[in-house]
UniProtKB/Swiss-Prot annotation:
GO terms for biological process: ATP biosynthetic process; proton transmembrane transport. The chain crosses the membrane at residues 62-79. This is ATP synthase F(0) complex subunit f, mitochondrial. One of its GO terms (cellular component) is proton-transporting ATP synthase complex. Disulfide bonds: none annotated.
Length: 88
């Protein structure tokens, strides 16, 4: 018989749609909890793409691509006006 995992300990993909609001309210939204979530995400990314036996530049290039897309989205408002100019 499978053991029942409490709602607080379930991952997001294991939560049913009806349980989602109560699952979100159980999360830790303190600064240390948010920092811990970012730290866990960083370690998961690092161990999956960077810290591997046969590593390549794929993991670092994904970070660079995300950085470029983020900065483009951030400055799109100014770039949009320059695109419409004819000479300068």
């Amino acid at each position: 018989m499978a053991s029942v995992v409490p709602l607080k300990d379930r991952r997001l993909l294991e939560v049913k749609l009806g349980e989602l609001p109560s699952w979100i309210l159980m999360r830790d939204f303190t600064p240390s909890g948010i920092a811990g979530a970012f730290q866990r995400g960083y370690y998961r990314y690092y161990n999956k793409y960077v810290n591997v036996k046969k590593g390549s530049v794929a993991g670092l290039s994904m970070v660079l691509a995300a950085y470029v897309v983020f900065n483009y989205c951030r400055s799109y408002k100014e770039l949009k006006h320059e695109r419409l100019r004819k000479y300068h």
